[in-house]
Amino acid sequence: HSWLMTLFAFLISDEFPDANMDKVIKMCIIHDLGEAFTGDIPTFEKTKENEKTEENLLNNWLDTLPENYSAEMKSLYAEMTERKTAEAKIFKAIDSLEALIQHNISDLSTWSPNEFELNKTYANDKVAFSDYFTQLREEIRKDTLKKIEKN
């Protein structure tokens, strides 16, 4: 997931000339490191308590890194969480859209029952800031519907 997100960010960098896409790529690389400690919990199952546990374990690990890396990563995580900068918004759109693409690639037997409806609307709010991402989301939705209809 992180690798494909990183490639995604690199390949669309021309679409966002005013954004620091190197920062977006760094966000893509590090965003799921906390899951190394907690496991991958699906977004629709993750609770605030899960998020807090993951954050605490991640911060404990970040504190073991050399200060320059720890500080940069903590800064990136804060920016991603606040989701106010163009880079953080681009990162979150990529994260959400890549997850949908993974679902469209995967066999329907791997989908949980709620994903059949969720995948039709998921990420709409994450892409609304960008015409480019909104159009891409619509193309991914079309692929989702085709996949469901074929089954």
Locate each region found by the language model.
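Active-site helical microenvironments for divalent-metal-assisted chemistry
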Residues: H1-N151
